[in-house]
Design a protein with these regions (language model features):
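Cytochrome P450 core scaffold surrounding the K-helix E-X-X-R motif
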Residues: 12-16, 44-46
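Short consensus segments that form the blades of beta-propeller domains
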Residues: 21-26
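Short glycine-rich phosphate-binding loop at a beta-alpha junction
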Residues: 68-74, 236-238, 465
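Short alpha-helical segments and helix-capping/turn motifs at coil-helix boundaries
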Residues: 18, 55-62, 176, 446-449
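Conserved "right-hand" nucleotidyltransferase catalytic core of DNA-directed polymerases
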Residues: 1-9, 13, 27-34, 119, ...
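A short acidic (Asp/Glu
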Residues: 14-16, 80-85, 248-249
């Protein structure tokens, strides 16, 4: 028997004001289960403020026991919820979201149930529930009759989507893809087991690593700030701005950025969607174009703006002599509170760009690869600065992406349940989020892997990597 399933659950707000409907959150509950099978369209409430369907657990389990293929949209979510709620199912599965992904053959299209059905013209999701979701009202408190209509409709259109996809798989151009769909279904079950098992994180080690690299980031910030002041005077540089970092390294900036991009043919070709080809120039031609279309950046000395007394804002006066209620940005200092006076000394490191490939839309390239390459070719104070910047950027990413990500999603018992996704990349490779648990730093550069421990006494962690398996 083929059974289509759709579940609704409660959710909690996470630290970033997003929604966490995870079955692993201790406060989340399975609210309802919708089924479409040989027994018709059925709907059961397992937890709701208005009603609970009597004997529903036994009935739902009976349906699952008779099911030979379980179908759902984003089925891994539904399957994990059912298993975590105590239901049992070990049969075959089919996810219509993965089916659509496979049939798209690498072309990026939205895989929501709404968009999949809309493209195939086989029905629409009931969006009346959106008002309650926007208000932060969870499914257990939304009127039960509305939840039931919404859930029954989801099951119906998921079944239509399944039938439509099965017809597509019969087409000569898609016949071989059914094997891929079966494999992806088997993999979905494995991933659901992995996510349910989770990973044990040693929170004490995580805090120690976090403190160590937070301290190094603070040290590098101080070191970089000192170098920037020596090179730029009172001009502040936002190191996250490629344009401002370019001023510091190359001591020059474009006179007209639009014209600059045109001269060096920077941007994307609208016809091909690829980067435009840079002009072929001799070194002398290149240097001449840079010189004629850029201006030097000079060190500055700042003094307090007298117009606003260094506050950056003023209160304008009405014709009757009374002040306006709200403050206005000071036009003399543009809200900065300081007036910057250009000095006669050139700012920055005055690095010389070598070719058109060093040029960017806002000046000169300062991406990670360029900075690392430039550091290896430099010496003295420039080398010291570039090494510090490269290390600072790496630590910043490490702290915000890996440490903070793991910290935010690990529960008080040290269990982490990353989400593994099969239908995000164009190539079919796996991806993960909440947190990103792929591409963890290797070797001794960053010891993030120290925090992952076996949950068993005297247990070991085995790491296996299949090189280019796909």
């Amino acid at each position: 028997m083929i059974t289509v399933i759709d579940v609704e659950t409660t959710y909690q707000k996470n630290k970033h004001n997003g929604f966490d409907p995870s079955p692993f959150h201790p406060d989340n509950k399975l609210v309802s289960v919708g089924l479409e099978s040989g027994f018709g369209n059925e709907y059961y409430f397992t937890y709701h403020s208005e009603k609970v369907s009597e004997g529903c657990f036994e009935t739902i389990q009976e349906r699952l026991d008779q099911t030979t293929l379980l179908v759902g949209h984003n089925l891994k979510f539904d399957l994990m919820w059912m298993l975590e709620a105590g239901f049992k199912y070990s049969g075959k599965v089919y996810d219509t979201m993965l089916g659509e992904y496979i049939l798209n053959k690498g072309i990026r299209k939205s895989l929501t149930l709404q968009m999949c059905c809309q493209r195939r013209k086989i029905g629409m999701k009931d969006d009346r529930i959106k008002y309650y979701m926007d208000e932060g009202i969870t499914f257990d408190k939304i009127p039960a009759d509305l939840v039931e209509e919404y859930g029954r409709n989801d099951v119906v259109i998921t079944k239509r989507l399944f039938d439509s996809q099965m017809q597509d798989f019969k087409l000569p151009a898609n016949k071989d893809l059914i094997k891929t769909a079966k494999m992806m279904g088997e993999f979905l079950v494995v991933l659901s087991d992995m996510e349910r098992n989770g990973i044990y994180v040693d929170l004490n080690v995580l805090e120690k690593v976090n403190a160590e690299y937070t301290a190094e980031k603070a040290y590098l910030t101080q070191k970089i700030s000192k170098i920037v002041y020596n090179k730029m005077g009172d001009t502040e540089i936002n190191l996250s701005s490629p344009e401002q970092l370019s001023w510091l390294i190359y001591s020059k900036k474009p006179l007209d950025k639009a014209n600059w991009a045109k001269i060096f043919n920077i941007g994307v070709d609208k016809a091909t969607g690829k980067s435009k080809r840079r002009p072929q120039l001799s070194i002398n031609q290149f240097r001449s174009l840079v010189k004629n279309n850029s201006e030097p950046v000079y060190k500055t000395s700042a003094s307090k703006c007298l117009h606003c007394d260094g506050k950056g804002v003023i209160k304008r006066i009405k014709k009757d002599g009374s002040p306006y209620k709200n403050y206005t940005k000071c036009s003399e200092c543009n809200g900065d509170g300081f007036i910057y006076h250009k000095m006669a000394k050139l700012a920055g490191f005055n690095q010389v760009p070598k070719s058109v490939y060093d040029v960017s839309e806002s000046g000169f390239r300062t991406d990670k690869i360029t900075l690392s390459k430039l550091a290896s070719e430099s010496e003295g104070e420039l080398r010291e600065f570039l090494d510090a910047i490269v290390r600072y950027n790496a630590i910043d990413t490490y702290l915000s992406t890996f440490i903070a990500g793991i910290k935010d999603h690990t529960d008080s018992h040290g269990m982490l349940h990353p989400k593994f996704m099969q239908a995000v990349t164009a190539t079919g490779r796996l991806s993960s989020r909440d947190p990103n648990f792929q591409n963890q730093p290797r070797g001794k550069t960053f010891p993030i892997r120290q925090v992952v421990k076996s949950r068993f006494t005297n247990g070991k962690i085995l790491e296996i990597d299949f090189s280019q398996l796909e």
